[in-house]
Amino acid sequence: MRKALRSLLAASMLIGAIGAGSATAEAASITAPQADIKDRILKIPGMKFVEEKPYQGYRYLVMTYRQPVDHRNPGKGTFEQRFTLLHKDTDRPTVFFTSGYNVSTNPSRSEPTRIVDGNQVSMEYRFFTPSRPQPADWSKLDIWQAASDQHRLYQALKPVYGKNWLATGGSKGGMTATYFRRFYPNDMNGTVAYVAPNDVNDKEDSAYDKFFQNVGDKACRTQLNSVQREALVRRDEIVARYEKWAKENGKTFKVVGSADKAYENVVLDLVWSFWQYHLQSDCASVPATKASTDELYKFIDDISGFDGYTDQGLERFTPYYYQAGTQLGAPTVKNPHLKGVLRYPGINQPRSYVPRDIPMTFRPGAMADVDRWVREDSRNMLFVYGQNDPWSGEPFRLGKGAAARHDYRFYAPGGNHGSNIAQLVADERAKATAEVLKWAGVAPQAVQKDEKAAKPLAPFDAKLDRVKNDKQSALRP
């Protein structure tokens, strides 16, 4: 009886947090211009204030919002999901950003936010700490639950920010923005997804093999492969250094099993990581095959990162690897040039990076469903990729009549995993910028007459628009 009463109480509290329409509407009705934006947000049930950081021309708030652990059974527990608000004006459009990982608590602005000169809501992905339910029921970490998190936060904030909304994100964040539109297609007026991989069939990854056969020039590809092999030929010497470094820095290898296994993963990432974060012009930095072990060690650490497969490096990203091994899929690349020097064939797959007490079963079909929706039913979708980014090997595909639905896919020439609209060729840059402005409802008359006139509405801000160093020290989108 006591347990039932607690469950009923929890359900009633959550229903109050969800707002059942009336509570949110009541909070939103306080729309007097003089009302403080923080006070207006805090009147929404489930909102908590964490901190505010000053930034000229904006209000920047760090908040949490109470979410159900399971959106299908909202009475079965809640957790606090962290998000930030870069507030400009309620009369401006709002961009909903997510990285698909943790949220930064320092003021920043995504490219679409600068283009439309709007507000930005940035949300932390569920299960990335501190936005993790306790205890953690990992079966509730899937793309629908995460999309439903975004949907609820959007519903809570829409009465305050009533103008048009766009969704955006890069890499896993671009995937997240796409999944959000698939499950809640009417929430956003448009979506800008950057460098978002689309692993429709996890067992068929030949597109990546083709990519690595053609990326950059032949000399660079050949030298990278040679150095990758040499790193494994000198394995024993380098692993001894690796173990010494780990001991001195308190790093352990319980999840992957040993420093030797971790090292093989690090080396397997080497070529992928080079193209993910570097350019053809950086090929001159690739050491000679006969380089000293010191040079080789430094190059491997600079490109792949020795910390990535330690327990401490993996822990933060357990939610990603769980998703990769249950729904998202993960790339598998053939490495014929490494024949005879691999000790653990097949080790570089998601199950290797998730603690064994967390059960994982791959559920095929989730990515194929999203892929079908994008090709057949999506509208107002913009996908931006980098020509030399490995994750572009399996991009989202546009179906028949894409242009009529205002769906676009552009590639930044020579671009890597940091590619954006600004790096597109002139005509595509103008088209993409014009579409974003139109979706947001703020396209100037000049742009409506001639899309070539399209440019960001907000001036560049060196701090707010700085290029983030989101480099992952392991193979992650």
Swiss-Prot record:
Gene3D superfamilies: alpha/beta hydrolase (3.40.50.1820)
Protein species of origin: Streptomyces mobaraensis (Streptoverticillium mobaraense)
Family assignment from sequence similarity: Belongs to the peptidase S37 family.
GO molecular function: aminopeptidase activity; dipeptidyl-peptidase activity
Entry keyword set: Aminopeptidase, Hydrolase, Protease, Secreted, Signal
A Gene Ontology term for the protein's cellular component: extracellular region
Temperature dependence: Optimum temperature is 45 degrees Celsius.
Region (Disordered): 448-477
Compositionally biased intervals (Basic and acidic residues): 462-477
Gene: ptp
Prodomain positions: 28-33
Gene Ontology biological process terms, A to Z: proteolysis
Protein's name according to its UniProt entry: Prolyl tri/tetrapeptidyl aminopeptidase
Cell compartments where the protein resides: Secreted; Cell surface
Signal peptide: 1-27
pH profile of the protein: Optimum pH is 7.0-7.5. Optimum pH is 6.0-6.5. Active between pH 4.3 and 8.3. Stable after 12 hours incubation from pH 4.0 to 9.0.
Function: Has proline-specific tripeptidyl aminopeptidase and tetrapeptidyl aminopeptidase activity. Activity is highest against tripeptides containing an Ala-Pro motif. Involved in the final processing of transglutaminase, by removing either the tetrapeptide Phe-Arg-Ala-Pro left after TAMEP or SAM-P45 hydrolysis, or the tripeptide Arg-Ala-Pro left after SGMP II hydrolysis in a single step.
Regulation of protein activity: Completely inhibited by the serine protease inhibitor phenylmethylsulfonyl fluoride. Partially inhibited by the serine protease inhibitor Pefabloc. Not inhibited by cysteine proteinase-specific or metalloproteinase-specific inhibitors. Not inhibited by prolinal or its derivatives. EDTA and EGTA both partially inhibit this enzyme. EDTA has no effect on activity.
InterPro entries (UniProt xref): AB_hydrolase_fold, Peptidase_S37
